[in-house]
Amino acid sequence: MLLAGVMFAGAATAQPKTSDKAMWKSARKMAKTLADEGWKIDGSRSMEEMLYNHYQKLNDENNQELIANVIGNTSVKTMNQGQQWAQINAATTYAKQAKMMVVGRITNETGAGIEGAPSVDSFYEGYESQVVTEIKGELKKSFSLYREKENGGIDYKAFYLLNEASASQARIRAMERAMLESEFARANAARISEFVRNGFSIENEE
């Protein structure tokens, strides 16, 4: 089984600078919580070190965190399967939120009466589907965890970073493709482009 090649590292790591002590403390606390839940690091570095490095990157205001879980009935047999499903889950989660953000802005702009119009619904569905495709290449995996199950499978959790500048370009590409199938979107291209360009805060599921 692939898990045989995965280690939980316990090697000592360099203590961070004094100014980063709060971040290091948070990383250690989160690492303990995750370890208590049975999670192990997929890699040779310690969980607290990977969390600390992850938190440092989140200090960049252009980066957001996206956490993907492959757990429960969707657990997998290998790490490669976990990685593939996690990326799909992350992209799907982001695309749903991107669509709902546009739905809300269009509804506020045009009124609720526009909802349900075939051309509008076609654009929403097409936009969500295209965002899934476009955003996959922009997701940068920070690190991942696994948890062995009694049935021989594993739960998998991946932590991604998403840069808003790259995400915005991905949303624009998705919008342009979705507009090809929507008369409503083509007629309102300028306003919809403005909505799509505006970023939003990602909501991660527990």
Language-model segments: residues:
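Domain-level marker for long, solvent-exposed, non-transmembrane regions
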Residues: A14-E206
